[in-house]
Regions:
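A structural signal for short, well-ordered beta-strand segments and their strand-loop junctions
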Residues: 22-25, 67-73, 114, 131-133, ...
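Short, basic, glycine/proline-bearing loop/turn elements
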Residues: 42-47, 124-130
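Active-site-proximal loop/helix segment associated with metal-binding centers of metalloenzymes
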Residues: 86-127, 158, 179
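Conserved beta-sheet core of the metallophosphoesterase superfamily
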Residues: 128-216, 222
Length: 226
């Protein structure tokens, strides 16, 4: 599901700048076969998607990226739901994938951050800015997420690069850092919102009290600040 042009650009930036922290904000693996819609529809093509290849590609990218934190996105969260499935085969498969992910992050000494919407347990902080996968999905998601958290924030849930100020007395800003997925995925081809999807990432500087966030929109030119 990842776009090699986007992932290669991000890896190039990471190797050039060598940041102290490198956080992947979620959906590193697709797990399409575990999608609720695919489970309900016996004719869904996603039911035949190879989870082993998907998992290997995602973990290989995270290892090459040398992440220090991996935030679970709503795609990875499918595993948490299915780990308690009454179907023993499904629950075993979900548990096996979770264990594989945990082993890979243990080898990197990286933290796995759980997915919990906008709750505190799914957020991590640098300076005055919260980082999370995100859960709001609308055209003002950057603004609304910053308002919901009452904080500056960086997230990726809606797959586009955007920055919006919150409607609050304190000057909070929401940063949407884009994605590295193929921009023309079949499962969302009927959604007009996919036309605003863009490859990108966030980077910056931080202290104990402040965080300066810079957004990079890669598509369509893929020009890096190197």
């Amino acid at each position: 599901l990842a776009d090699p042009k986007a992932t290669n650009a991000i890896l190039k930036f990471r190797k050039a700048w060598k940041p102290d922290e490198c956080w992947h904000l979620g959906d590193a693996v697709d797990l399409a076969a575990m999608r609720a819609g695919a489970q309900r529809d016996p004719d869904s093509g996603d039911r035949a998607q190879d989870m082993a290849d998907d998992l290997l590609a995602g973990l290989s990218y995270l290892q090459e990226l040398e992440v220090t934190k991996w935030f679970m996105g709503n795609h990875e969260d499918r595993l948490a739901r299915l780990a308690y499935s009454p179907n023993a085969v499904v629950s075993y498969a979900a548990g096996a994938v979770i264990a594989r992910m945990a082993d890979a992050m243990k080898a990197l000494k990286a933290e796995i951050v759980p997915y919990a919407g906008l709750r505190p347990e799914c957020c991590r902080q640098l300076g005055d800015t919260l980082f999370l996968h995100g859960s709001l999905y609308n055209m003002q998601a950057s603004r609304d997420t910053a308002e919901a958290l009452s904080s500056n924030c960086v997230f990726v849930h809606t797959h586009k690069v955007a920055m919006e100020k919150a409607r609050t007395q304190k000057p909070f800003t929401g940063y949407n850092a884009g994605c590295a997925v193929r921009l023309h995925v079949d499962y969302a081809k009927n959604n007009r919102s996919t036309l605003s999807w863009s490859h990108g990432f966030a980077w910056g500087e931080y202290t104990d009290t402040h965080c300066i966030v810079r957004l990079e929109q890669l598509s369509p030119h893929y020009r890096l600040p190197l």
